[in-house]
């Protein structure tokens, strides 16, 4: 009996020791592989960072004195008083108010250092450095120091357009009156016309939306955020693109479903039209919080009113001049959101239509106004860009 007990205890001790050794071995292996993975990620990060630095240096060399000023990170901290006054935040990072040594105010967009490989950052610096227009934001400088990246813009006292068109208001008063709304819409159109035709290299923005339109003290609009922009030669009409880019609600159909036509400057025209429709309505074109999309898709409702020559019933219209202004903005927008890119006007034509008389505008063809369901919007928001017959 005693020998049996001793034998059992001996076997138990061996099993316990084996289990402990096995556990220790697994922990050692896990630690080894963890170190390998961390070392690999670290190596990839520094390789990417080194490549970014090479691209930035090449960019500075190519542009010489035309390149924006480069600041080091300590200067960025000093101009923002150690990031004291935060203006906003998004997926890209945060924006802070700052002051340059000459006393002028700036908005400093500090990017998430470990996000991506720096392509969007370099893209934005390269794009805006090619521009000089009253309706395009001016880049005062940038910072690229290790994983610390920042873009420094001229400060816009009135912030972005979105806060003036979506915030709560009364049933009869708008935050921005119709003369200012028209001025903003025309200014954005002129800025896009410049990007498409006025630059040595054509710039396609691909993310036109109220959030990316900044307003100065006189409500003069400035197109901003060129992180998704694409540069191409002026003679090029169709550009190649891997994957969809833009924001749901403003993305042109051909970007999601390539069988509808090639991606070109007409994609910006579509985004512009959708944005102006939200400006005149003071609301989102699609309310993703409601499932009955037939009842909530604003462009459908507007087209029916125009087609039947009925009052648009838009908020804040005080006289016949404002009524004509509103109707003109709606007509132009409905031309811009045509499903077929070839049916959309160029931005030069948009400017011409906005500056012309209402009675000179032809009724636009009825576009295939597609309003996505809530589930489809949710799937698009997480990056699942799919094309089917139901949404073309």
State each model region's role.
Residues 7, 11-392:
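Conserved eukaryotic protein kinase-like
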Residues 1-6:
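Extracellular/luminal ectodomains of secreted and membrane glycoproteins with large N-terminal domains
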């Amino acid at each position: 009996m005693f020998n049996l007990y001793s034998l059992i205890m001996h076997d138990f001790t061996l099993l316990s020791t084996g289990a402990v050794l096995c556990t220790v071995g697994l922990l050692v292996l896990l630690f080894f592989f963890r170190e390998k993975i961390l070392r690999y990620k670290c190596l990839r990060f520094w390789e990417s960072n080194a490549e970014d630095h090479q691209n930035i240096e090449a960019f500075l060399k190519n542009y010489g004195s035309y390149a924006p000023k480069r600041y080091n990170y300590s200067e960025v901290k000093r101009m923002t008083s150690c990031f004291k006054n935060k203006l906003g935040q998004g997926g890209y990072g945060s924006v802070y108010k700052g002051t340059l040594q000459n006393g002028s105010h700036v908005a400093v967009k500090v990017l998430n250092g470990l996000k991506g490989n720096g392509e969007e950052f370099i893209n934005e610096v390269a794009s805006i450095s090619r521009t000089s227009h009253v309706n395009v934001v001016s880049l005062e400088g940038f910072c690229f120091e290790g994983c610390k990246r920042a873009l420094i813009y001229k400060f816009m006292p009135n912030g972005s357009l979105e806060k003036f068109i979506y915030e709560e208001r009364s049933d009869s008063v708008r935050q921005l009156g119709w003369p200012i709304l028209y001025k903003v819409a025309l200014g954005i159109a002129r800025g896009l016309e410049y990007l498409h035709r006025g630059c040595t290299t054509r710039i396609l923005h691909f993310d036109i939306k109220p959030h990316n339109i900044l307003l100065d003290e006189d409500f003069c609009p400035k197109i901003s955020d060129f992180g998704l922009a694409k540069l191409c030669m002026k003679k090029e009409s169709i550009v190649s693109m891997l994957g969809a880019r833009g924001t749901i609600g403003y993305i042109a159909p051909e970007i999601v479903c390539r069988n509808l036509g090639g991606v070109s400057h007409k994609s910006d025209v579509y985004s512009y039209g959708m944005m102006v429709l939200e400006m005149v309505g003071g609301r989102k074109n699609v309310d993703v919080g409601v499932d009955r999309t037939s009842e909530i898709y604003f462009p459908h409702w507007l087209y029916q009113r125009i087609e039947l020559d009925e009052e648009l019933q838009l908020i804040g219209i005080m006289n016949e001049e404002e009524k004509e202004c509103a109707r003109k903005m709606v007509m132009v927008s409905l031309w811009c959101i045509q499903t077929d890119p070839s049916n959309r006007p160029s931005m030069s034509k948009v400017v011409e239509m906005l500056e012309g008389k209402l009675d000179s505008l032809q009724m636009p063809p009825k576009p295939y106004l597609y309003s996505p369901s809530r589930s489809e919007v949710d799937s698009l928001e997480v990056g699942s860009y799919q094309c089917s017959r139901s949404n073309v």
